[in-house]
Structure formats: structure tokens, C-alpha cells
Amino acid sequence: MKLNKYIDHTLLKQDAKKKQIDSLLSEAREYGFASVCVNPTWVEHAKKGLEGTDVKVCTVVGFPLGATTSTVKAFETKEAIQNGADEIDMVINVGALKSGDLALVESDIRAVVEASGDKLVKVIIEACLLTDQEKVLACQLAQKAGADFVKTSTGFSTGGATIADVRLMRETVGPDMGVKAAGGARSYADALTFVEAGATRIGTSAGVAILKGELADGDY
């Protein structure tokens, strides 16, 4: 198994400096991760820094709360793609889901999917805030709206990925949709366990440490 190709090498901290982004890009080039995941302001810089590699540029939309309007999320998506983004990680409208407004949740996801064209869309359900029933509903709505992946977490709420959540999400969406575990893998063993549970992508700031077999600091 080429575990590096499961990893979205991530730096989403609001105080990230250019030199830290450059370090992220350098590590991505060296280790050949699936993607780097950065905030929208860094997309253009990341695209240039990864020229000549097969590492994708992933960015976030409606992040981290998911509480912007669908129009804003669609605009963010289009601009990110214009700037070079290959993949979009969007946050659902969590409040709408918990209020039972499933039509709004679905249309919100669909707005981003339609704005993304042929680019990959991952839907962050923020599992730590949801009941198991709500997790299932969120995954079903993401699938119905045409997204490519469901993703556990933003890394900015009360918890990250759990094995139980990844397993539930995989059982819900079946074998043909991606599942991204974010915020729970701190070691090589953690990463393998998530993959065995059904994850096809792992979002982490600790990709290098994981591949080296070291225990990473931090919780994303």
C-alpha cells in the first residue's frame, strides 16, 4: 500500500506563514502526497509550488463553520478553481441539518458541486456535532447531490475523525464514494486503521511523521 497517496498534507491554521506553506509544499514534493490542503488565499502559491508534480491542490469552502450562504460557497469554489484548485473540501450547513431542513443541506452541496465542474468535491459533515442518524443523513445528501467524497471533520470543532464514524460513513455511501478521515491520524498505525475502516483519503498535518513511523504532535 502506498500510504502517501492516501494523505492530504494539510495546513489550515489561520496564522500560517508563507515559509510554513513553502515547507508544506516541499514535503509534498518529496513524499508525493495525494494533495496539499491549504486555505484559499494560498491556492495560487501552492499551484505554482507544485508545478511538475502529480500532487493536487485542495482548498476549503464555507470553512470552518459551513454557515455562509450557498451563493457565497459557489463563488468561493469558482474562484478557488480559477486560482488553480484541483479539489474542494466544503462544509455542510450543519445548523440546517440539525434543524431538519434536508432540502437546504442538499441544495447547498449541489451548488458547490455544480460550481466545481469536473473538480473533486469532498463534503465535510462535521461528525463530532452530529448524531449517528444525522451522520447517515448527511452522507446520503452528499451522495445525492453528486459529491465525490464525504469527510469527517474540519479540525476546528470539538473532535476529529473516529474509526466508528469512518466505518459508519463507508457503510452508508457504499464502495464507490470516497471517505476522508480528518483530524484523527497521528501515527502510521492510526492511518492504517482508518484505511481498514474504509477511508480512501486521510487529512492530516502529520503526513511526514506518519510515513516515518513517528508519533505526531497536534490533533489534526
Swiss-Prot record:
Pfam families associated with the record: DeoC
GO biological process: 2-deoxyribose 1-phosphate catabolic process; carbohydrate catabolic process; deoxyribonucleotide catabolic process
Keyword set includes Iron-sulfur: no
Active-site residue numbers: 89, 151, 180
Gene3D superfamilies, alphabetized: Aldolase class I
Keywords: Cytoplasm, Lyase, Schiff base
Record-linked SMART domains: DeoC
Reactions the enzyme catalyzes: 2-deoxy-D-ribose 5-phosphate = D-glyceraldehyde 3-phosphate + acetaldehyde
Family per similarity comment: Belongs to the DeoC/FbaB aldolase family. DeoC type 1 subfamily.
Protein role: Catalyzes a reversible aldol reaction between acetaldehyde and D-glyceraldehyde 3-phosphate to generate 2-deoxy-D-ribose 5-phosphate.
Name the UniProt record assigns to this protein: Deoxyribose-phosphate aldolase
Upper lineage: Bacteria, Bacillati, Bacillota, Bacilli, Lactobacillales
Gene assigned in the entry: deoC
